[in-house]
Amino acid sequence: AIDPAQGGSPQDYFNTVLWTGNDADDRSISGVGFQPDWVWLKARNHTYNHYALDSVRGDDAILFPNLTDAEDTTDDTGFDSFDSDGFTISQVNGWEINDNGKTYVAWNWKAGGSGVSNTDGSITSTVSANADTGFSIVSYTGTGSDGSTVGHGLSSAPELAIIKGRDAGYPWMVMGYPTNTSFPNDGSFLTLSTTDAMGNGTGSEISLGSSTMTFVDAGGNICESSRDYIAYCFHSVDGYSKFGTYTGNDNADGPFVYTGFRPAFVMI
């Protein structure tokens, strides 16, 4: 649990910052409160893409959560560095992360730095993990072999894994914990980049219920041979995070979804 009485605070591991673009170069976005390991940012008043960067892939590698596009490693994307209290950005035409007058939001997570080698699975991975908050960033190269495993670095099995092929146009796969009957361990998935209902298909079956992720069906979406992938893994932590499902009731007074705390970030 994250317990303020013991010196811990949720804001030490997750925080949201807002800013208004000014076209400047080398602009420091501060107030995060820590050096972020995963930054997800978006213009709030424009249709610019979502941008996702992390400390494992580096500050020059951008993925787009609203697109299936491969990772872009263009030298100058406008995201300059991860800093001790946030990050530094510049306005670059075509990237638009500090466009004059545009309002922006960035969600920031703290993991475990740039990552270390993890050999818990049959695939060696690079993992940046924060065991206290149940969050890790996992980089690995696929094998194409059913039953391959990869370590995630967490103290409990992930309840949620968001996986993206970095070097090809694969969808963002959102995979749930297998014991959740609403999100079964049978290849079921959601995708960030579409409005599609839950899917189920070849190349997507994964088991999360152990110290490693097991690629039951190691297809292109999650473990194609010689392809590079990034996975963001989560499990619930009392007082900090909660993952699950709920059923709507088509009523203005909708269902109450208990988390045990007031959330700072909700993804539905």
Give the ranges of each region predicted by the language model.
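Surface-exposed molecular-recognition determinants
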Residues: 1-268
